[in-house]
Amino acid sequence: PIFSIQQSSMDQTSFEDGTIILISAAGATGKTSLTEHLSNELSIPIFDLSKHDPVASNSLTGLLYNNMELQDFAQFSMKLKEGKSSMIIDALDEGFLKTTIDGFYSFLDDVAKMSNGAKGVPFIMLGRTNIVELVTLYLESKNVKVVLLQIEPFTVESAKVFIDKHVESEGKTKFEEQYKTVRDYIINAIGGFFKNQSEINHKQYLQFIGYAPVLLAISTLLNDNNNYHALLEDLKSSNRRNIQLVIDIIERILKRDKEEKIDKLLLPTLTK
């Protein structure tokens, strides 16, 4: 992925001085793959909040304590302080949804306590843009030096590669030319929608087409329709022109978020 350094509310913290690196992305922009790559390359553990019980005070230290021998726990905690090891905390947005605001802030208090005075970067934290901004403000209020990175949207060409990797239908291999034709038609049709809106510029089109949930929605459409010739003709029909295609994609994104975020994470906490 392509990263950009974002300005935080405090004076810009240099990459070398930061004790926590926060990585934000608008949606499913490869954060999971990035997390796994960092963990493998750096040989550091991952604390995935989407798979953990709702966090609160002592969740972080409790996790380490419960998964290590007492001696290993003490050594790893010391390594975090001395800059000899790090830990990845993933899925901040899921963690936020599963707990109370006080519980989430208590969890961040633990992170801040372990980070203040530490050498190196004890924590790398990832999540969606809105929650990462909240975490940044809270940690900075606790005098933690934060470096804020953002995963930039895919380019048009990398968007095509992303779609190709997520389309697994046999038709893609058997009818490669037809597949690429309809794939490119969809991308261009979305561009046509933005082009026809005078108040929306080319940059916003690139942000939309580079947004991973949009690409996942396109991939789902191509996975669900193996007859690419028929799909192309349907897309070209008068009732499926640019604006309807964009609406269809947005509806798919909303459905995916409902199934993955609201149904799985939020509703269980509301019905307890």
Predicted regions and their residues:
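Short, flexible/disordered intra-domain loops and linkers
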Residues: 60, 64, 96-105, 136, ...
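Extended hydrophobic
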Residues: 38, 132, 140-142, 153-160, ...
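Conserved P-loop NTPase "ATPase switch" module shared by AAA+ and STAND
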Residues: 79-104
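Short acidic, S/G/P-rich loop/turn micro-motifs used as interaction or catalytic elements
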Residues: 29-30, 52-56, 92-99, 130-132
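Sensor-1/coupling segment of RecA-like P-loop NTPase cores
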Residues: 114-137
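Walker A/P-loop-proximal flanking segment of P-loop NTPase domains
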Residues: 1-20, 37
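Conserved catalytic network of the ASCE P-loop NTPase/AAA+ motor domain
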Residues: 77-81, 113-120, 141-143
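Post-nucleotide-binding-loop coupling segment downstream of the phosphate-binding loop, primarily
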Residues: 21-86
